[in-house]
Amino acid sequence: MSNISFSTNPNIAPSAICDLREAVGWARQEEDYPAALQGYWATVGGFDVANTLVAWCAIVSDGVRNAVLLDVIVHPLHQGKGVGRTLVAKAIEHIKAHHITIIHVDFLPERTAFYQRCGFRVGLGGIYEA
C-alpha cells in the first residue's frame, strides 16, 4: 500500500471531499457537504505525504446497534493498492469500538468482490430514491 495515513473524524474542508468525488467521476455536490459533514456520525480520511485527501468515507449511525458506510471513495491514483480495504477496515474498527454490531453498505454490483474481501456478506436490500 502506498504511504497513506488514516484519521477518524479529521477536519476536512468540504472542497477536498468534492475534489475527491470529482476525481472518481462523481458529482461534486459542493452545496451539500457543509451540512452533510455536520450530520455524519463519523468520517474516516486517508491522506498522502502531502496531506492531500486521497480516500474518504462517511458513517451514519444510531449510535447503538446500526451503522452505514457511505461514499467510500479512493482517488484513482491510489486504487488497487489496498487503500480502500484499509479505509473500510478503519471505519469498521471505529464502529466496533462503539459496540455497534450491524454494519451496512450499499454498492454497485461491480463492487461486490471488493466488499466481500472487506468481510461483508451480500444480501438482499433495497434503495428508494425520492
Label each residue range with its predicted role.
Residues 78, 82-90:
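Conserved acetyl-CoA pyrophosphate-binding loop and the N-cap/start of the following alpha-helix
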Residues 104-113, 129-130:
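Conserved beta-strand-loop-alpha-helix junction that forms the acyl-donor binding cleft
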Residues 118-126:
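Conserved acetyl-CoA-binding loop of GNAT-fold acetyltransferases
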Residues 95-107:
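Conserved GNAT acetyl-CoA-binding A-motif
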Residues 32-40, 47-50, 54-73:
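A conserved beta-strand-loop-helix scaffold within acyl/acetyltransferase catalytic domains
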Residues 9, 75, 108:
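Residue-level recognition of the GNAT/N-acetyltransferase active site
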Residues 1-32, 47, 126:
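Short amphipathic alpha-helix that is part of the acyltransferase structural core
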